[in-house]
Curated annotation (Swiss-Prot), chain A:
Reactions catalysed, as given in the entry: O-phospho-L-seryl-[protein] + H2O = L-seryl-[protein] + phosphate; O-phospho-L-threonyl-[protein] + H2O = L-threonyl-[protein] + phosphate
Name of the protein in question: Probable protein phosphatase 2C 67
Binding site for Mn(2+) 1: 77-78
Lineage: Eukaryota, Viridiplantae, Streptophyta, Embryophyta, Tracheophyta
SUPFAM superfamilies: PP2C-like
Comment on bound cofactor: Binds 2 magnesium or manganese ions per subunit.
Annotated PPM-type phosphatase domain residues: 35-344
EC number(s) given by UniProt: 3.1.3.16
Any single GO BP term: negative regulation of leaf senescence
Effect seen on changing residue 276 to N: Phosphatase-dead, unable to repress the plasma membrane H(+)-ATPase AHA2 activity
Binding site for Mn(2+) 2: 77, 276, 335
From Swiss-Prot, chain B:
Coiled-coil annotated spans: none
GO biological process: auxin-activated signaling pathway
Cellular compartments per GO CC: plasma membrane
Gene: SAUR64
Protein known as: Auxin-responsive protein SAUR64
Annotated source species: Arabidopsis thaliana
Keywords assigned by UniProt, alphabetized: Auxin signaling pathway, Cell membrane, Developmental protein, Growth regulation, Membrane
Length: 370, 141
């Protein structure tokens, strides 16, 4: 069959010029084009298997209403293994499209439903694999999703990844955090858990100088982590080291995202979406300053490097030496990091027709050791 | 082939030897507050419970004894967030480990050593006190 080749859109052309690349433990796409502007993505692996995943989807957001065009961005920071974050990357966007098609529009409910169904389906997979692969019950992931559509940006978050908006202001740029985070080291997250579990004195335990839910996990909401959601998974054959010692009846973690909706103004330059591996080393303001003051090409990799330099400093070593460390043992020096920078154009890229649909999945192929 | 009993016996012997060394070895201390955080080329840094700073060549990260050491450090203190890696052992024990690693042990000896590390950790837990970081420095090559 002959494929039409005369309808290559701007996004396609850009992809050819700036393809996705892998350099050692770094995966990146220095510059691409989404519906409302340019974007840049970069990831670095520290765990023996990359647990972070990410994606960007641009084009129609429903199956039945071509006027609903937009950009979907997802950052998924897995823990206990890569299965949950990979599952989200495979499933959440098709689900979002399905629910958006029902109402023929994007809404907070549509996004929340996509999160809920992704979690529900992952737990179904855990059930299916329970007899042969019970440790799937201890795998989970944070899920940060951004949808830019109709002059609005929806940020939905379960876990502790973060989205920060860069808003130009008096010659500089101001950081506006768009995501609400769920980490036990935030007072708000602790209050929420204590009020949900008033009769459990060990719902939050301080371990290694950090608050952890039941003494095991820092995030207070997540996708997966079946053993903390349903008591039926908190038992044999799941290995004792992954189990809670006591029985519970009420789910300890939930998958509900916190959603914020922001109307974009011409002052809004870009949004940075990243896993906590980045924010551990860079403040919101430091990150937006770097993006504001640097060329767009390769900006995600630049942020990654800034975070790694900071990580090296904390470990009292040189950045060049840090980059030599193999995955696995590298986790003692920094976490897996994913960063996506989405630039916001006040007007869609093409005014007469929509930019070509775009779909990029971050992190493939990636190094893996046993 | 060695049996487990023999391995444990060996491990105990090493611990006794380590205890003997503890009495003899003393560390050079730098007299003034130096720029102790200067990064040595090709090295990573581990602090001990008695606040001695060790800088190891990166190649040590592929040694199984050192990987075990990092694992134990993670179990003991969690992954470090705002600072350097701290081992749950004191400088004397770490010094002793280095000597063994430098001697290039055979597989059986290494196995026994790994067991010994784990048991030493259990006994060191009660006396774990993080002291103020001093200016002691140690470069191991």
């Amino acid at each position: 069959m002959v494929k039409p080749c005369w309808r290559i859109g701007a996004g396609m052309e850009r992809s050819k010029i700036n393809p996705t690349k892998v350099d050692g433990l770094t995966w990146y796409k220095d510059l691409g084009l989404h519906t409302f502007g340019e974007f840049s993505m970069a990831m670095i692996q520290a765990n023996s298997v990359m647990e972070d995943q990410c994606q960007i989807e641009s084009g129609p957001l429903t199956f039945n209403n071509p006027t609903v065009q937009g950009t979907f961005v997802g950052v998924y920071d897995g823990h206990g293994g890569p299965e949950a974050s990979r599952f989200i990357a495979d499933n959440i966007f098709p689900k979002l499209k399905k629910f958006a098609s029902e109402g023929r529009e994007i809404s907070e409910q549509v996004i929340s439903k996509a999160f809920a169904e992704t979690d529900k389906d992952f737990l179904k997979t855990v059930t299916k694999q329970w007899p042969t692969n019970p440790q799937m019950a201890s795998v989970g992931s944070c899920c940060l999703a951004g949808v830019i559509c109709n002059g609005l940006v929806y940020i939905a978050n379960t876990g502790d990844s973060r989205a920060v908006l860069g808003r130009s202001e008096r010659g500089g740029v101001r950081a506006v955090q768009l995501s609400v985070e769920h980490n036990a080291n935030l007072e708000s997250a602790r209050q929420e858990l204590w009020s949900l579990h008033p009769n459990d004195p060990t719902i939050l335990v301080m371990k290694h100088r950090l608050w952890r839910v039941k003494g095991v996990i820092q995030v207070t909401r997540s996708i997966g982590d079946a053993y903390l959601k349903r008591a039926e998974f908190n038992r044999e054959p799941l290995l004792p080291k992954f189990r809670l010692p006591e029985h519970f009846t009420k789910p300890i973690l939930s998958a509900d995202p916190s959603v914020t909706i922001t109307r974009l103004s011409p002052q809004d330059e870009f949004i940075i979406l990243a896993s906590d591996g980045l924010w551990e080393h860079l403040s919101n303001q430091e990150a937006v300053d770097i993006v504001h003051n640097s060329p767009r090409q390769g900006i995600a990799r630049r942020l990654l490097k800034a975070a790694l330099k900071e990580a090296a400093k904390k470990r009292e070593m040189r950045y060049s030496d840090l980059t030599e460390i193999h995955p696995g043992v590298r986790r003692h020096f920094h976490d897996d990091i994913t960063v996506i920078v989405v630039y916001l154009n006040p007007h869609p890229v093409k005014t007469n027709s929509w930019a070509s649909p775009l779909s990029i999945r971050g992190g493939y192929p990636m190094h893996s050791t046993s | 082939m060695m049996n487990t009993k023999k391995l444990i016996k060996m491990a105990k012997k090493w611990q006794q030897r380590a205890a003997l060394h503890r009495k003899r070895i003393s560390f050079q201390r730098s007299s003034s507050a130096t720029s102790s955080t200067a990064a040595e080329k090709g090295c990573f840094v581990v602090y001990t419970t008695d606040s001695t700073r060790f800088a190891f060549p990166l190649s040590y990260l592929s040694n199984s004894v050192f990987q075990e050491l990092l694992k134990i450090s993670e179990e003991e203190f969690g992954l470090p967030t705002g600072g350097p890696i701290t081992s749950p052992f004191d400088s004397v024990f770490l010094e002793y480990l280095i000597k063994l690693v430098q001697r290039r042990m055979d597989a059986d000896t290494e196995k026994a050593l790994l067991m010994s590390i784990s048991s030493a950790r259990c006994s060191s837990q009660c006396s774990l006190k993080l002291q103020e970081r001093s200016t002691q420095q140690l470069l191991v090559f």
